[in-house]
């Protein structure tokens, strides 16, 4: 029956608590060791009265159980990472082991009801001691301690932003997003185009302004010569021919003046008044 009961108990192992991790197991052992150190202390110490100085005593106490060779300053192998021969230098606790031990005890102290602000394993004196141990062992052993930093995986938002930026850089710009081209600069006026003179400084070629102001009409001139010839009793035929020729000459001058006005207006320049005199 007992054997059967033993078989039942072994078979019912599925209902047992899960096995603790390696970190949790080591933390329990470290906390038990520290509690034993407090009980063996003279005089015995209580956890509530423990300070950073007591933690330093505990760390120095653990050096006698260390397995790391730390060369002294006078040792011929000082600073040598791999000495070729043994030396009488003592064994110590490695800095990495002490740093991990303090971290586990600091967590265990708070798990057992300790206040975070009164945690002796987080005291400043303990941090300074660990820093001194790290520097001294690095020089004595010729090893540079460099804390490895974890590389955080990129978040989904940052990866999506990076992908969008890469897609925007590779894809051609859309016409709507592309800026409108600037308007072309105004073209210079060609050399053959003559600038227009200022307003009000050129002659207006209209026949009304020429007739009666600058030229004498042909009919008035003939009448004037006929009257003068009749009064003087001269040769009417001669004067009539002369006036007729003068009338014809006035018509030619009128045509020449009109042609000059048209040419001057096309050229865009002023016409001298001497043309009509």
Swiss-Prot record:
Residues 1-16 have a biased composition (Gly residues). It comes from the Eukaryota. Keywords: Developmental protein, DNA-binding, Nucleus, Transcription, Transcription regulation. One of its GO terms (molecular function) is DNA binding. One of its GO terms (cellular component) is nucleus. Residues 178-187 have a biased composition (Pro residues). Residues 1-28, 141-203, 225-245 are annotated as: Disordered. It holds the Pfam family ALOG_dom. Coiled coil: none annotated. InterPro entries: ALOG, ALOG_dom. GO terms for biological process: mRNA transcription; post-embryonic plant morphogenesis; response to light stimulus. Its main location: nucleus. Residues 154-177 have a biased composition (Low complexity). It is found in: Nucleus. Residues 19-28 have a biased composition (Basic and acidic residues). A motif (Nuclear localization signal) lies at residues 147-151. Residues 22-149 form the ALOG domain. Belongs to the plant homeotic and developmental regulators ALOG protein family. Probable transcription regulator that acts as a developmental regulator by promoting cell growth in response to light. This is Protein G1-like2.
